[in-house]
Amino acid sequence: MNINVADLLNGNYILLLFVVLALGLCLGKLRLGSVQLGNSIGVLVVSLLLGQQHFAINTDALNLGFMLFIFCVGVEAGPNFFSIFFRDGKNYLMLALVMVGSAMLIAMVLGKVFGWDIGLTAGMLAGAMTSTPVLVGAGDTLRHFGLPSDQLAQSLDHLSLGYALTYLVGLVSLIVGARYMPKLQHQDLQTSAQQIARERGLDTDSKRKVYLPVIRAYRVGPELVAWADGKNLRELGIYRQTGCYIERIRRNGILANPDGDAVLQMGDDIALVGYPDAHARLDPSFRNGKEVFDRDLLDMRIVTEEIVVKNHNAVGRRLAQLKLTDHGCFLNRVIRSQIEMPIDDNVVLNKGDVLQVSGDARRVKTVADRIGFISIHSQVTDLLAFCAFFIVGLMIGMITFQFSSFSFGIGNAAGLLFAGIMLGFLRANHPTFGYIPQGALNMVKEFGLMVFMAGVGLSAGAGINNGLGAVGGQMLAAGLIVSLVPVVICFLFGAYVLRMNRAMLFGAMMGARTCAPAMEIISDTARSNIPALGYAGTYAIANVLLTLAGTLIVIIWPGLQ
């Protein structure tokens, strides 16, 4: 039996879609030196090649893909979006505006100089910025802009062509820039990271190991009684001196949880909780007492939970003000926008921040109730909230404004982005509402993006040869300019106008470009994860601004004719 693969694919859109995705994802795993192609560019290249052979896909699949992607981007940005606007994120907001605004302006100037249409110009901007939100925003606005069908088809083809030609240029140039730009300034990033670490009392070791606290029991001997000198536990401040705290005391056979007024006595058995290295550093006064094994004394359930910051008595306060150790809990990690932050006593907490805390289950629960809630380790997604806010986003996108003879529609991209932000924001404030496991959110976002990339590649593939011959060289040069010049402008603005610490600044610049590979290089150069503070500050707002940039460049373009 002979199987005509071409006829089989042309007759089955679903099969064609998943063949493109599978081949593209395989291609995306290839590496060019230290640079991995990535899923987006892999799927785009395969779809362009198959598009040249006149394979096509239903446009409804393409639209659903971009809608899912942009909605999930909003959900991820939601918890931190408003805090960046309304509190101490002014510098991060300004950096993101400078980065995105200068890139959009340069792209429009180059588009006019080279005589491109809006499709090539917006596609080049999206590729040079390695930003699929720009591509999604521009594509959605073009579809609702009232263009004639033939002009719309050409603009959409040019949009994906410009993105495909400049994406790798944008990615590689930014990675190279992240590696060598720090060496061109007077301050090296390692020194800058150490400086801010000294100022804030940070742990500069990005490879800091995290252990679960352990519990050990000791019998109070004469050395420890002499060391205590009659002071109660509150006056002794045992945790500050040893890194351990006393969880339980057995005295005269009676087991009790001590309060701050308790005084150690000869013959007491005490249960100390702390990290292994803290036990190893215990003062000889403790070690000279006999270590004991008491099943009841050591019977304690140590748990590690992720606590989401929500309550007003924690939001806006510094980490040190929580006094977690005073409540018998140990902080392991601080996570913001999926980025692990340095454990900094001066970090101001935002709604939606995640604190990984270890300690006795009862104590951890008490701390969680005080500052927020324990993240639900559930595999069940609140599909009702997901669908409801998705519908709201589509309805917002239908709103249009009329100015004389000119009409402007919000569009699906902006509507879904706003609805996603609201869902993410509400989720950060209400633990039982709108829960979406991070794995599920990542899967839907990635799948939506891959479907969208497959669709635009297949639709643009037929004309790629003509496009390469006509504008290929111009595109590569323009992509390099749009990729690097805004980064230089942003650096000058942050260094000499905002006077930011260099390590924080470079992290914020990579966040404004939403480029995780470049962020890894900055962290390696600084030998610290301190730049992650800056990256997390600009990342959420940059995702939103880049989507709006794709919409704005399409709206502004006709006025430049």
Swiss-Prot record:
Any one annotated GO CC term: plasma membrane
Protein's name in the database: Putative transport protein KPN78578_08530
One example of a Gene Ontology biological process annotation: potassium ion transport
InterPro entries: AAE_transporter, RCK_C, RCK_C_sf, Transp_YbjL_put, YidE_YbjL
Species in which this protein is naturally found: Klebsiella pneumoniae subsp. pneumoniae (strain ATCC 700721 / MGH 78578)
Topology within the bilayer: Multi-pass membrane protein
Swiss-Prot/TrEMBL keywords: Cell membrane, Membrane, Repeat, Transmembrane, Transmembrane helix, Transport
Membrane-spanning segments: 8-28, 37-57, 66-86, 94-114, 158-178, 383-403, 406-426, 447-467, 478-498, 540-560
